[in-house]
Amino acid sequence: MKEITDLQRKMLKKYHLDAMVTMTPENITYVTGAYIPTQVTVRSRKVIHIITEKHDPVVIVVNIEEPIMRAQSWMDPKSIISYNEFTQNPMMIAIDKLKEFGMETKRIGMELSYLSAIDMDLMHRELPHAEIVNADAAYEEMRFIKMQFELDRIISFASNIEEVIYGAFASARAGMTEKDIYRFISNGFAEIAKGDKMSMPMVGSGVRSCLLNGEPTDKVLEKGDIVRVDVMGTKDNYYCDCCRTAVVGTPTEHQAETWSKLVKAHDDAIAQIKPGVSTKTIYDNFARQFTEWGFKPVAFIGHGLGLTLHEEPYINTYKDTTLRENMVLCVEPIHVIDGECGYQLENEVLVTADGHRMITGTRHPYQQLATIRADG
């Protein structure tokens, strides 16, 4: 895709790089359009993409996955190089290609947070006069702003995720287990994802709702339990991430009031989202509000979403990113009452030219705490 290639070359100039060597699964998918499944499950099956200012990009892929690369990728078929994983070292093929491109004394950007020590040593031995630098920031910046095809995938997928969550709440009863809720969610997810996968199943009830990423167990749902459900998964390689909280039976006054405050924190944060706004400002306003209520602010209340579940920009106090049009954010304030329960509300939001647009949170009203039947 020309837009991706042009964007990479823009990053080459901005970060003063002569070449970019891409290896992480998410960035391989971004720069090639193909998802190679065994790149994740078999670590030795490297996929390596190389681009320079003057040379057309090439991609190196294990021979058994070459058909997938050819079928899914927008790369020129002539630029796809396959290797035998038992007789060839893909890093050496990449190094030879860099030499062919005249990169022996140039500045080469790589994802050093991903590159193994063995591969880094090989790069230094074979290209002793090249400058190998960390290009993680360049990749983060490339994926900050979503292209239209990315937005189409994210929005189409996420638009149905609320139905899955509220369908599970409607099917659940006191006396069932967390695993029963997960089964309802899994079945609903399979229907909308059409073959793609759910990751990190998060269902927690009662005191287990305090566990931010707790997997479902055989714990039985009891009247009065707070139940927190976070649905995360992929379709066409792009993530959805949406969370809701419910109570088994009628909420107490305390539960309803706590939820009302969480909704206000969530809505106030989203109301600030528009191009030019500082993520740190959004977080600091949230933290001030939570502190006034006597709640403990969590470390972040939002993150980017796309080919990975959590990506830049984060909404926290540690980084200050200026929001730009076509960023996709998840806004997710969380309130945990230690030893008792945890409340969370999460929605996906698109930054638009003049403000924002809710991607989730439009199908079912979230202003009232959702309920699960307590009559068994």
Give the positions of each predicted feature.
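Active-site neighborhoods and metal-handling regions in enzymes and metal-associated proteins
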Residues: 1-376
